[in-house]
Design a protein with these regions (language model features):
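Charged, low-complexity intrinsically disordered terminal segments
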Residues: 1-190
């Protein structure tokens, strides 16, 4: 936490990493769903779903999805089935957690159950590793993160599985979609 706090207070570093590399956008529309979206068919939830469906359906070249758990509804699978039949067929690229990187094994199991179906829909699926080979290039002092940690809850509950790699286990939690490099949907980047 101390190392991260020092980086967060380093204004030149923040500017170099985030401000200098920022892209200009021409238009931003904000839409959200209700917290209890699964319990409601409210107008705002239906409108949000329709907007997302229309954006994805408009894809001409690529749909790039980033999600920690690749679990699609029946309607979403139908949409991607229609895209597969389209000429030219847009490339569907998915970045998601691997089993080793996920924090929700049961959701990964559900995703794995449907993986063949997603591949038949033409998805190119890339799974995030918990210890990426280039983590030290992406995160300053990566090997020092987690040093001296005393969190052994997992050991107590599941038994020991000693790590042979320095650094902390990484996992993806961001949810986003980029369509044709032009439209971006950002879910919860937390």
């Amino acid at each position: 936490v101390g190392i991260l706090g020092a980086h967060a207070g380093n204004q030149p570093e923040i500017s170099r990493r985030f401000v200098d590399t920022a892209l200009r956008v021409s238009q931003v529309d904000y839409f959200s769903d209700q917290p209890q979206k699964q319990d409601s068919k409210s107008d705002s939830n239906v409108e949000l779903g329709d907007r997302i469906e229309n954006l994805i359906a408009s894809a001409q070249s690529t749909v790039l999805m980033q999600t920690p758990y690749l679990v699609l509804s029946g309607d979403a699978r139908d949409l991607f089935g229609r895209l597969k039949e389209q000429e030219p067929r847009p490339q569907i690229i998915v970045s998601t957690n691997s089993l080793a990187a996920t924090d929700a094994f049961y959701v990964y199991a559900l995703s794995h159950k449907y993986k063949k179906r997603y591949l038949k829909l033409g998805f190119s699926i890339y799974e995030f590793k918990p210890f990426p080979a280039d983590a030290d290039l992406l995160i300053n002092d990566y090997a020092l993160l987690g040093a001296g940690s005393t969190n052994n809850y997992g050991y107590q509950r599941y038994g020991q599985a000693p790590l042979t790699i320095q650094g902390v286990r990484l996992g993806m939690h961001a949810k986003s979609i980029v369509i044709d490099g032009q439209a971006t949907l950002i879910g919860s980047h937390n």
